[in-house]
Amino acid sequence: MLRYVYFNGFGMRQGLLKRCSSHILRRSYSSDIRNIGILAHIDAGKTTTTERMLFYAGKTRSLGEVHRGNTVTDYLTQERERGITICSSAVTFPWNGKRINLLDTPGHIDFTMEVEQSLHAVDGVIVVLDATAGVEAQTMTVWSQADKHRLPRLVFVNKMDRPDADFNKCVEDLKSKLETFPVCIQYPAKSNEGQLGIYDVITLEQLNWQQKDLGRSYSKLKLEPSDGLRQLQDKRNELIDQLSGLDDELADVVISTESFDKVSNELVNKALRRVICQQKAVPVLLGSAYKNIGIQCLMDAVNHYLPAPEERNEIYNCFGNELAGKVFKIVHDKQRGPLTLVRVMRGELKRGMRLTCSSGQAEVISKLYEPLADEYREVSVVSSGDVALCAGLKSTVTGDLLTSSQSSLKNAEKRFKQQRHSDGMSEEEDDDEDHHLDGLFDLAPQIPDAVYFCSIEPPSISSQTAMEQALRQLQREDPSLRVSYDSITGQTVLGGMGELHMDIIKSRILSEYKIDVDLGPLQIAYKETIEAPSLTTLSVEKEIAGTKQNVSITLELVKNQSEIFSLDKSPENLQNLNKLRPRIVQVLRKGSISALERGPRVGGQVVDTQIRLHNAIIGRGTADAFIMATAAQCVQKLLSENGTRLLEPIMALQIVAPSERVSSIMADLSRRRAIINDVLPKGDRNKLILINAPLAELPGYASTLRTISSGTASMTMQPCGFSNMNSSDESLAIRRAQGLE
């Protein structure tokens, strides 16, 4: 139910959530906790910003630097070697009376799943922008993920010390590309020497950082009229005007006062907090993490403006004082084994406590830790609203809801249902809720489709078991890693989100498990679709263990992008279908759909196809497994006899290159079946090229681009759908999939 009401915004109206949570037994807990995530495009400065936060909060004694490989949050060997974040990491630190639990997330598109998991555990986010680039491709991706979870957010415009930084462009990008309402509470103040300071719009002060003590201290200078005070006052008036249009309480104050100057800073801050928590506006701050400027103000903004745990997740109030914990990540520690990261929604987690996970398995917490990336401090209890690492949980998986017992979960469901009825819910709402009752608190992550596949082989037969164990652990940690067994080739097959993702998996198996596995050539994850509708009847009769098994089924495949399975409601078939028990229909549905997982051309998933059941005659005593297998055979027969067409994945590329290199880059792209959508100016010397190109034409393209541009161009790439192929490209793809090219 949570997936539909709260996180994804589907299902029942928000009003229902408010009605229920206002009556159900409430749990009070500390409002001094802030659970936040930090999101950005790759290389915008997320990890550097996080490292500065830890340093100024007193958690670290030296500044961690990405280029030196000594950061706290990027602790994997691969992260330090490559200078990128691969796995989300949790850190806890105090700041001005508040306790901040921060999750640093990856910026590369291959690790979007890490971001998705982390957002289940936070109450607000910081979105970091590169001041020289504005809103970039992955910024838009993570922003839409935050929208899905309805998370309040702050924007931090980083790298403002750079000569080519453009604060105004970043603000315009927020409006045009993200369709949000930015309110600037800071503006850049650059000295004649180029030293970056910050104008505080609310207090009308100029803030200047001291570099002698690594930015630990900064001065506040009250502006005089000669220092541009009038211009800053105009900005403050503009801010108040914007907020009063969004907040009724502030609007009433503005109407009753003579001028904006009479509106106190306290009233402005309170109004700002309300509109942020209601997601009516996004405050914009600025600084330079690398130059140690603006980080303290950013942490103050987290404390002042982002919501406390009790202001979110009201739906969990049905648990009262009982435990409700949300599993959002699992990591493997060499000494401690699997460690489960849990956001405690209600109740308390205690060392030695018995738990029940979503599968119904009983678990016992052997030890509890406070997170600090890959270092942990043992604690005995973790309260509501906080984040903990649990050791000893063996059956729990990402997305589970942890409760103190099955009866506790049932009582919470009962309490919630009672409240729904006492609130006078309509029949339509009631039916919708009952439909999802089995998954009332299901938080299983939505795993994106794999982009690449490849085989994986151990160095020797004796290493096979160890490799399979390593893959199980990595898959538990990273749900976007797909592991399957190909019965035709007898190989283990990996599915991943990109070349980098697969490369990292191989590297981690070597460095963490000491197994030098061999990866086969990367195969594109093509999909297949039918060319025309087709209809067939399959009758199968066998005797198994002395029992006669008899199934006759008529199925049709038609083009459809919405519903994957349906019943033919025509008069000649309706009478027969109405006689089928719902359980038999579900068995037929499950068997039919399973056959779409592997198409006849290259084994790709069959999409944009609907299975329509026309008729089914099931003999008495026929086993469900036999019915399911017959349905799958019928679909496979239709696909094999009538054929499918390939659909190839298309990637959206954004390339930034010097103007003089654009023609050579575009000439190379034209040979790769690319479609150039636009070429836009990017600063004074660069161009931004927007391209759609088939993934099959882009293996190793990052290296090619570096060669063509002599290392001056950069690119980002993300999936943007699938497209039909012409016959020659399709034939080439099939030969490549068969290893003939």
Swiss-Prot record:
Question: Per its UniProt record, what Gene3D superfamilies does this chain match?
Answer: 3.30.230.10, 3.30.70.240, Elongation Factor G (Translational Gtpase), domain 3, P-loop containing nucleotide triphosphate hydrolases, Translation factors
**Where does the UniProt entry say this protein principally localizes?**
mitochondrion
Q: Where is the composition biased (Basic and acidic residues)?
A: 411-424
Transit peptide residues? 1-29
Name a GO molecular-function annotation: GTPase activity
Q: Name one GO cellular component term.
A: mitochondrion
> Which UniProt keywords are given for this protein, alphabetically ordered?
GTP-binding, Mitochondrion, Nucleotide-binding, Protein biosynthesis, Transit peptide
The tr-type G domain extends over 31-310
Which amino acids does the record list as binding GTP? 40-47, 104-108, 158-161
| GO terms (BP aspect) | mitochondrial translation; ribosome disassembly
Family annotation (Pfam families) = EF-G_D2, EFG_C, EFG_III, GTP_EFTU
Name its cellular compartments. Answer: Mitochondrion
User: Residue ranges of region Disordered?
Assistant: 408-436
What is stated as this protein's family in its record? Belongs to the TRAFAC class translation factor GTPase superfamily. Classic translation factor GTPase family. EF-G/EF-2 subfamily.
Its biological function?
Mitochondrial GTPase that mediates the disassembly of ribosomes from messenger RNA at the termination of mitochondrial protein biosynthesis. Not involved in the GTP-dependent ribosomal translocation step during translation elongation.
Official protein name in the record: Ribosome-releasing factor 2, mitochondrial
Tell me what organism the protein belongs to: Drosophila willistoni
